[in-house]
From Swiss-Prot:
Residues 507-518 have a biased composition (Low complexity). The keyword Endoplasmic reticulum does not apply. The gene is vgrG1c. This is Type VI secretion system spike protein VgrG1c. GO terms for biological process: protein secretion by the type VI secretion system. It comes from Pseudomonas aeruginosa (strain ATCC 15692 / DSM 22644 / CIP 104116 / JCM 14847 / LMG 12228 / 1C / PRS 101 / PAO1). Forms homomultimers. Part of the type VI secretion system (T6SS). The keyword Secreted applies. Part of the H1 type VI secretion system (H1-T6SS) specialized secretion system, which delivers several virulence factors in both prokaryotic and eukaryotic cells during infection. Allows the delivery of the Tse5/RhsP1 toxin to target cells where it exerts its toxicity. Keywords: Secreted. Residues 502-522 are annotated as: Disordered.
């Protein structure tokens, strides 16, 4: 093949690249690095390879590459070397760059990490090697983690992941503001999938700016993050019929439009504002007949409407990037994904506008030295996938979102020294067993709601899980970012309250006093269901308060024992009835006081015995009446004193006997009216060794018509007949 002859391939652009060593003619077999060392030199080639093995060890024969906004680039290289035994491990994971010669003498670089390399059987005098270049971001597909991020914005989370893995070749070109995520979980996924799905949700994408020694990931979200490469602000279109052109140009154009949904609505729920409507909607207007079909999704992953509007807009913009695509094929060597350019010279004038390259494919072929022309022929072709520069680009969600496929257990955590750590909603924080990054404290997770047996408006049941207890955590929609506690379980450290299986028939609730409670400090309601030993046990560690707003009934089938170690107060605001069908015994070891504000009636069906070991005092404010149906007996062991403040009347319907063992004295304090004793009967007998009657004014003895009157001055005897016997 003559020097300068085009290389016959299907590629559309042939670049004539003359080799300086071609003037010597074709070398002999095996003589490329011997007699003709200049022939294995890269300075004569369109694409230069800079590998970890050195600048002249590997040379490019073929390149097929693809890059896309928000996606990992991949460049497949066919390389040749005069060394058939290159150490592949010296390439794996190392950076490698390609330098593509541009018009005017500048260069465009393709830089990447060797993700894969292999060796084939070779072709002629050269060994054949295959290398795949990927961005450093691709290495994140080779690492995974389970990790929690709290109170961070997505760009900060992404950059933290990059830095933690040792990467710093990135640039923040974001222009929008982003909300702070209270809780974000990387769960059983690669670090690449994690940051990718976060970017897709927030409408962030990336592309790579290539330099000789590195490639830089550019985080982007708007037009301002992009630029036109030098010399490629405007790129013309030349149809194939016009033949070869010296300047870079496009020779093939294809535009397609596709019906896409015209609007997207999102909705979500915020338990802190359960009555607030959070539905949002975003529209994109198009002029065709089927532009109004709506999409709806739930949950939208937000609790503030403005955040929902951002997500709805982001998602509908991602869909609308598929509405119109323009594909341009040609040999515009300096343009790649993330670049802007203006198309010119296309016959349809409305297509001569500014475009953003969202995807690019490259193909480069360089001749082998064994063709005899020194490797001078090379061809380059690119195919660009473009959107109108005025159309916002957003990545379509394609990264799988991790789904927690069942409940998990976790341990309740909190600050050091606390036993219960909760907020106004009864939420708690936990440490997941898979989390190797936290310190098992109050910062281990977000606040998690706790399922209760009953939940009403200021009513229901509540039991707050305590620090150290193991709980069951479920996830709403399987989303690791939306945990909710649905149960609790025992373990070997937090074990059951009753010894099992010996007490398998026991069930109940037993608490622990806090703070500083010991096993001896608890409240408990326990049921024993063992046949023949059934029991309901209630233990209050301190106070027990029972409120019954209407009736209360108690039934005890057998005995009841009640022991109160201190005082008891019973206050019955209306009537009280107490019935004892058999005997009742009341023992008061000290004093007893009883007050009846009005009447009291005591009825004893048979006998009453009252024993007072010492004195008895009874005060009656007004009258007192005792009715005894038959006998009445009063025994006083020693003295008895009866005091009547005014009058006293004793009435005996039949006989009365008064027996005094020793002396008997009746004293009547005088008055103007005098005193009177009336004894009616057949006989009154006074028997004594001495009887004395004393009166200050008069003593009168009367029997029938006879009287004896004694006054201080005289004794008068009146009788029909007086007999005095001496």
């Amino acid at each position: 093949m003559a020097i300068g002859q085009p290389f016959a391939t299907a590629l559309g652009c042939t670049i004539i690249w003359r080799a300086a060593g071609a003037l010597f003619g074709p070398p002999a077999a095996g003589d490329y690095q011997g007699r003709f060392p200049m022939l294995f030199s890269q300075h004569t080639r369109l694409v230069h390879v800079d590998s970890p093995l050195g600048p002249e060890v590997l040379q490019l024969q073929r390149l097929e590459g693809r890059e896309e906004l928000g996606r990992l680039f991949s460049h497949e290289l066919e390389l040749v070397s005069s060394n058939p035994a290159l150490p592949l491990d010296a390439l794996l994971g190392k950076p490698m760059s390609l330098a593509l010669e541009l018009p005017g003498g500048s260069r465009r670089y393709f830089h990447g990490i060797v993700a894969r390399c292999s060796q084939g059987a070779g072709a002629g005098q050269f060994a054949s090697y295959q290398v795949t270049l990927r961005p450093w971001l691709w290495l994140l597909t080779r690492t995974s983690d389970c990790r929690i991020f709290q109170n961070q914005k997505v760009p900060d989370i992404i950059k933290q992941v990059f830095r933690d893995l040792g990467f710093s070749d990135f640039e923040d070109a974001l222009s929008r503001s982003y909300r702070e995520w209270e809780y974000c979980v990387q769960y059983r996924e690669t670090s690449f999938d994690f940051v990718s799905r976060l970017m897709e949700q927030e409408g962030i994408y990336y592309w790579f700016r290539h330099e000789k020694k590195r490639h830089i990931l550019v985080l982007s979200d708007a037009y301002g993050a992009h630029h036109s490469p030098a010399g490629y602000t405007s790129v013309p279109y030349y149809p194939p019929s016009l033949g070869h052109r010296e300047r870079d140009h496009f020779f093939d154009w294809h535009m397609a439009r596709e019906v896409q949904p015209g609007s997207l609505s999102l909705n979500d729920y915020d338990f802190q504002r359960p009555g607030t409507r959070l539905e949002v909607r975003s529209n994109v207007g198009r002029a065709h007949a089927a532009a109004d079909y709506p999409l709806y999704d739930y949950p939208g992953e937000y609790v503030q409407s403005q955040d929902g509007e951002h997500y709805a807009r982001t998602r509908i913009e991602a869909i609308q990037t598929q509405y119109e695509r323009v594909r341009l094929r040609g040999c515009a060597r300096g343009i790649g994904a993330g670049h802007l350019f203006h198309l010119s010279n296309y016959p349809r004038l409305d297509q001569n506008r500014e475009y953003l390259v969202v995807g690019a494919e490259y193909r480069v072929v360089q001749e082998l030295y064994e063709t005899g022309n020194g490797g001078g022929g090379a061809q380059f072709e690119s195919e660009l996938d473009c959107i109108d520069a005025g159309q916002a680009f957003r990545p379509l969600p394609s990264t799988p979102v991790p789904v927690v496929r069942g409940p998990q257990t976790a341990v309740v955590v909190g600050p050091k020294g606390e036993e219960i750590w909760t907020d106004q909603y009864g939420r708690v924080k936990v440490h997941f067993h898979w989390d190797r990054h936290d310190q098992s404290n109050e910062n281990s997770s977000c606040w998690m709601r706790v399922s209760q047996a009953w939940a009403g408006k200021n009513w229901g049941s509540i039991q707050i899980p305590r620090i150290g207890q193991e709980v069951i955590v479920s996830f709403l929609e399987g989303d690791p970012d939306r945990p909710i506690i649905t149960g609790r379980v025992y373990n070997a450290e937090q074990t059951v309250p009753y010894e099992l299986p010996a007490n398998a028939t026991q069930s109940g609730t037993k608490s622990r006093s806090s703070k500083g409670g010991t096993p001896a400090n608890f409240n408990e309601i326990r049921m024993e269901d063992k046949k023949g030993a059934e029991q309901l046990f209630i233990h209050a560690e301190r106070n027990q308060d029972i409120e019954v707003e209407n009736d209360e009934s108690h039934w005890v089938g057998h005995d009841r024992t009640k022991t109160i170690d201190h005082d008891e107060t019973v206050h019955v605001k209306h009537d009280r009835t107490e019935t004892v069908d058999n005997n009742e015994t009341i023992t008061v070891h000290a004093n007893r006081s009883k007050t009846v504000d009005r009447n009291e009636t005591v009825r004893i069906g048979m006998n009453k015995t009252e024993t007072i070991l010492m004195a008895s005092l009874q005060n009656v404010g007004m009258g007192r009446m005792e009715n005894v149906g038959l006998g009445y007996s009063l025994n006083v062991g020693m003295m008895m004193n009866t005091v009547v403040g005014l009058n006293q009347s004793t009435q005996v319907m039949k006989k009365k006997t008064l027996s005094v063992g020793d002396s008997y004295e009746v004293s009547v304090g005088g008055s103007d009216d005098g005193s009177k004793i009336t004894l009616d009967g057949q006989s009154i007998t006074l028997g004594s060794q001495r009887i004395e009657l004393t009166a200050d004014r008069e003593i009168l003895l009367r029997c029938g018509q006879s009287t004896i009157r004694l006054t201080p001055g005289e004794i008068e005897i009146l009788s029909p007949n007086v007999d005095i016997n001496c």
